[in-house]
Amino acid sequence: MCDGAPAPGGADAVHRRLRKALGQALVRWRMLEDGDRVLVALSGGKDSYTLLALLDELRPRAPIRFELVPYHLDQAQPGYDGAPLRRWLEARGGEFHVEREDTYSVVTEKLAPGSTYCSLCSRLRRGILYNAAARLGCTRIALGHHRDDALETLLLNLFFAGELKSMPPALRSDDGRNVVIRPLYLCAEEDIAAFARARAFPILPCNLCGSQDGLQREEVGRLLHDLERRIPNLRATMLSALTKVRPSQLADEELWGRLGIDPSTRPAAP
């Protein structure tokens, strides 16, 4: 979702929670190594600005050395204006890259009017990011997905795709070239939204294409918000569930086979 609910506590409390959650994620899933060069995918939304700002703060005091390479992709969506983002990056200083690839025209040419754009658009954007990381000598790609993104993705796949999957905090790409990390994985969207407002980041519109996938995600986000009003700490509990999978208590025979689970096997005779 583009906006978050009000975050508890003042700006300092929000900042401390975000720093703590980011640090815990980096350590728990071993996201960074000494000497890493990290491409930070900067969309112009509150999440990626927050990610870059927190990593900027962490870098001078971290026990390892790593570089940050902000990278923004202009996908030529209608109504796009990236000038505020570029000015912000110039004021920040240091290396950054803004590149233009007209993926919007590719998607609209290949799909019928009214079709869902997000899947094809995401694949095209992912390929461009992977190639950019390799070309720029980056060893990691950092994305701004947070806790609520992971939970919304879980429910989207459950409700609309019939699959039990979400997004992992870290993964190696299928081609083996890139390691993708999500340092905000433990961060609440409401905290990120509050932090972004306090920092007055120049936010770019988050859904210029008006895709149906984006509307479904907003609907699922509202569902989670409504449920948490009735079930305290629901999202924290759901996130914990993503780290405590019990394959033998599910019904995926292929997964059973890979893990050597055979419920039909009789116990050995005494």
Model segments located where?
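ATP-dependent adenylation/nucleotidyltransferase module used to activate substrates
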Residues: 1-155, 160-164, 190-198, 249, ...
